[in-house]
Amino acid sequence: MTTGDCCHLPGSLCDCSSSPAFSKVVEATGLGPPQYVAQVTSRDGRLLSTVIRALDTPSDCPFCRICHEGANGENLLSPCGCTGTLGAVHKSCLEKWLSSSNTSYCELCHTEFAVEKRPRPLTEWLKDPGPRTEKRTLCCDMVCFVFITPLAAISGWLCLRGAQDHLRLHSRLEAVGLIALTIALFTIYVLWTLVSFRYHCQLYSEWRKTNQKVRLKIREADGSEDPHHSLLATGLLKKVAEETPV
């Protein structure tokens, strides 16, 4: 959707009915009355979501600012300082958002949430380590480790057996050469293993820090009559009614 010259202030609702592009959109969709268009952005200017509400429906129920759904099966909460139509959010939606963005605060009002972060298991990283290059590197190193380990062991054993045979035949030069070859072979193998292991441990450590399961420490009231949800709905409807132009 083209919003024309709308203001992009976090937490604000912009009246874009005067914009020609917006008028065309309203005519095409058949919505009739003008609408509020709220562009939700963070401080760095990145667009987070777009909220569209009709002006003549101040009695609409509050909706989640992330999934834009109402309180169907899950209560709406107001865990931060955002007000109006941006103040309601599902707990599960907010937890997914905080987990994907790797933050613990609201990107609009910068309120810190009380959260509990749990690292994801190693099996999830093995299935999806991140970008395609890292996934390819991990697969190649694992395949090389599986094939090179027995190959290095067999080669070292054969070199040592050959060195013993040459020592029995008093061929010390050949024996020393085979022993040196065995030492060089195992040195290269150990160094490659340590470097690869350290590299992937570093990638896993970074992935573990940025991919955590976030759980909000918020108590939700049980039952169909939720007093917190009722107060939240009343406040949101009052805010929408105040912002509706006459």
Swiss-Prot record:
Pfam families: RINGv (PF12906)
Membrane topology: Multi-pass membrane protein
EC number per UniProt: 2.3.2.27
Subcellular location: Endoplasmic reticulum membrane; Lysosome membrane; Endosome membrane; Golgi apparatus membrane
Chief place where the protein resides: endoplasmic reticulum
Region of interest (Required for interaction with IKBKG), residue spans: 121-246
Purpose of the protein: E3 ubiquitin-protein ligase that may mediate ubiquitination of TFRC and CD86, and promote their subsequent endocytosis and sorting to lysosomes via multivesicular bodies. E3 ubiquitin ligases accept ubiquitin from an E2 ubiquitin-conjugating enzyme in the form of a thioester and then directly transfer the ubiquitin to targeted substrates. Together with GOPC/CAL mediates the ubiquitination and lysosomal degradation of CFTR. Ubiquitinates and therefore mediates the degradation of DLG1.
Catalysis performed (reactions): S-ubiquitinyl-[E2 ubiquitin-conjugating enzyme]-L-cysteine + [acceptor protein]-L-lysine = [E2 ubiquitin-conjugating enzyme]-L-cysteine + N(6)-ubiquitinyl-[acceptor protein]-L-lysine
Domain notes: The RING-CH-type zinc finger domain is required for E3 ligase activity.
Sorted UniProt keywords: Cell membrane, Cytoplasm, Endocytosis, Endoplasmic reticulum, Endosome, Golgi apparatus, Lysosome, Membrane, Metal-binding, Transferase, Transmembrane, Transmembrane helix, Ubl conjugation pathway, Zinc, Zinc-finger
Keyword Membrane in record: yes
CDD domains: RING_CH-C4HC3_MARCH2
Name recorded for this polypeptide: E3 ubiquitin-protein ligase MARCHF2
GO biological process: antibacterial innate immune response; antiviral innate immune response; endocytosis; positive regulation of lysosomal protein catabolic process; protein ubiquitination; suppression of viral release by host
Keyword Metal-binding: yes
Membrane-traversing stretches: 138-158, 175-195
Assembly: Interacts with STX6; the interaction promotes MARCHF2-mediated ubiquitination and degradation of CFTR. Interacts with MARCHF3. Interacts with GOPC/CAL; the interaction leads to CFTR ubiquitination and degradation. Interacts with CFTR; the interaction leads to CFTR ubiqtuitination and degradation. Interacts (via PDZ domain) with DLG1 (via PDZ domains); the interaction leads to DLG1 ubiqtuitination and degradation. Interacts with ERGIC3. Interacts with ADRB2.
InterPro entries: Znf_RING, Znf_RING-CH, Znf_RING/FYVE/PHD
Residue spans, zinc finger RING-CH-type: 56-116
